[in-house]
Amino acid sequence: EQPGGDKVNLGYFTN
């Protein structure tokens, strides 16, 4: 959901 996040949800967009 949030690109460049830090495992915001389940690590979908973990940068």
From Swiss-Prot:
GO MF entry, a single one: endochitinase activity
Top-level EC class as recorded in UniProt: hydrolase
Reaction catalyzed: Random endo-hydrolysis of N-acetyl-beta-D-glucosaminide (1->4)-beta-linkages in chitin and chitodextrins
Keyword terms: Antimicrobial, Carbohydrate metabolism, Chitin degradation, Chitin-binding, Fungicide, Glycosidase, Hydrolase, Polysaccharide degradation
pH dependence: Optimum pH is 6-8. There is a 37.7% decrease in activity at pH 5 and a 39.8% decrease in activity at pH 9.
Any GO BP annotation: chitin catabolic process
Keyword Hydrolase recorded: yes
Top-level taxon of the source organism: Bacteria
Keyword Transmembrane found: no
Protein activity control: Inhibited by divalent metal ions. Maximum inhibition observed with Ca(2+) while the least inhibition was observed with Fe(2+). Inhibited by high concentrations of GlcNAc.
The protein's Enzyme Commission number: 3.2.1.14
Thermal dependence of function as given in the entry: Optimum temperature is 35 degrees Celsius.
Family per similarity comment: Belongs to the glycosyl hydrolase 18 family. Chitinase class II subfamily.
Function (record text): Antifungal activity. Inhibits the mycelial growth of A.niger, A.alternata and H.sativum.
Name under which the protein is recorded: Chitinase
